């Protein structure tokens, strides 16, 4: 059926038959029905295969009639779906739609691409802060912000069409001046669907630390404005209002900004010149010019011919000539050039480039900011999986920095990531992120030396993607009750809903059979109206922006098809019925507090990932873990030391709750402790036996004061964890003076981080860490010299020494002379911890 849909997709791209959209909608409905049947059958099979016992046999016999009834129901549904599938294939024949599997040429990142994808290096990914043609504008805006003679509150407006580079210029200048020249700084995205309360709340959270969210939730808009005004009147502040659409948007928030003649500044970006002239304050208007011919060609070449594409090719002259034509046809609009270059970098076929020159309706580019033709081309060039991944990113609010760890877990839970030979689903998902970045469909917001951390979508691409997602029935974005309940004639029925604000409607009643529910700004969710009823087929549920305590209703236990449950912000109380979620793959509360963790949660047989920021109560001695867990971490944070004392005593007796035999499949583990002042955790917590760690661990981070005491952990870790790739030990986890990496230990370790330890001597025995590539030492101030054995590590590529002024740097010099990358920094500002996904 996927093969037939590709032919339908291609024909709809050519605009051959709009009636095909109804057929596509029917196929999607059937596909969701099939998924529900398969899930239901799997759940039934698991229930029927529980370990035998006398009580289990009695229970099984008593439930046998119910079991037969459910089997019969599944059979009936299969018959109904089969009939619908047969009817669809009849429609395929009617419209002369054929399978395209044999002649599929559209780019697809399958297993044949795995080796090539692994060769892609992150520095080659699009870095939108590295701008071309904007040096003059950047310097002018910077000079206006820092003009010492102008003490008035001044609004500096950047005006230009969508995709012209307004936000890029503003971001560049903001990064240059914010910290060094202003007391308070905040960046706020306005967007078309902004709420006054939401913007004011973001300003408060941006300029005031440790703000009480509950107090803020009880305040009126005018009270918040007065609060901001009172706070800023003693500060020299910089506020960026990005993407302001209407004059009244400014009117609603301007009262929050006092003019106390101290050189405070507001930067405003807009497509509407009337908005730039509207503020009742001193105004400086900067019209953003489009790129000239030389700049357009330079930007296009940078995006269309990255080093990993052109390496070894000798036929680029013809491409460059066509590239000049294409770059100039974009009329100097940077976003159009970037997306075009990203698209063509994946299509280095001369016939494709010539087709682009001849067939695209370039007249549309003459309209301000209209790059629909280029976006259509880039989108249709994606595989079906990448299309879904891109549209999914557009569901996040405008200017939202999307954590890659969250994004990949959502993609996997949605079923967008295929199984690729030799790669895990997580690895494939990360390559999808890289692929979309290389195509310039997403922006890299933050990255480390080894991975992308957060991404964004340009507002023009997001608007385009949201519109397409609605038309295709991929998702429905809603900011009001009317949008939830209304079906539009040009939209297919959606199975995914995104709520951006408080919506007084029972979503499950308005949209039965819903597949995905994403809720942003959840602090404004009216929980007395919101209900889980009717959401029994939900697979993905995510709350973002909760600020208060919320006891989830017991009805959540009915959502047996749920694969992903995510929470960000706030404190959650989980009902015991959560253990009924027998299809759950990921429980993600890495940015939330769980007040009490049900003891049966970790016994769910399908559960693979558990990430929790803080657990306030957990009966660890009663908890059993199933064997399929792949990643698990919790910031250890109980409220009373007595609870921990009891837990540790029992942990020594029954270590399976965290490190024992039932936990041996875990491949990555983070053990993090925090200070007693902040979390109430006693710093005398210790690990009873390192040999209880899972032997197949790939990544390990230990960052808990005194956890290892003064017993050197390296001999045990080096011999027991034979597959370990990444290791970080920090924050005085080990308190001894000597650290010894044993002979032939750590055979597969390639990244080692030692942070804030009191070691005075480090011994590296022969044969230890032969594959080490990256070594980072930070704030180990008592260490005077590096081990001589580092010179003999042939695979060592990079050494970082941070905040260690007393270290003898002779060995650093020798390593640098031998061609290794050596970085020495006096401040730990840029130190990066190991990331456990």
What function would you assign to each model-found segment?
Residues 30, 37-38, 43-51, 60, ...:
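Surface-exposed helical/coil interface segments that assemble multiprotein signaling complexes
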Residues 55-162, 168-172, 198, 357, ...:
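Regulatory and partner-binding modules of innate immune sensors/adaptors
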Residues 84-164, 168-177, 189-191, 202, ...:
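N-terminal flanking helix/linker immediately upstream of nucleotide/cofactor-binding cores
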Residues 1-51:
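Extended, amphipathic alpha-helical segments that serve as helical scaffolds
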Residues 175-181, 222-293:
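A conserved switch/coupling segment of P-loop NTPase cores
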Residues 198-202, 213-240, 245, 318-332, ...:
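Mid-core helix/loop region of P-loop NTP-binding domains shared across ATPases and GTPases
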Residues 229-231, 237, 261, 478-495, ...:
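Cross-kingdom leucine-rich repeat
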Residues 2-3, 7-15, 203, 207-218, ...:
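Non-catalytic, charged helical/coil tracts that couple and regulate nucleotide-powered enzyme cores
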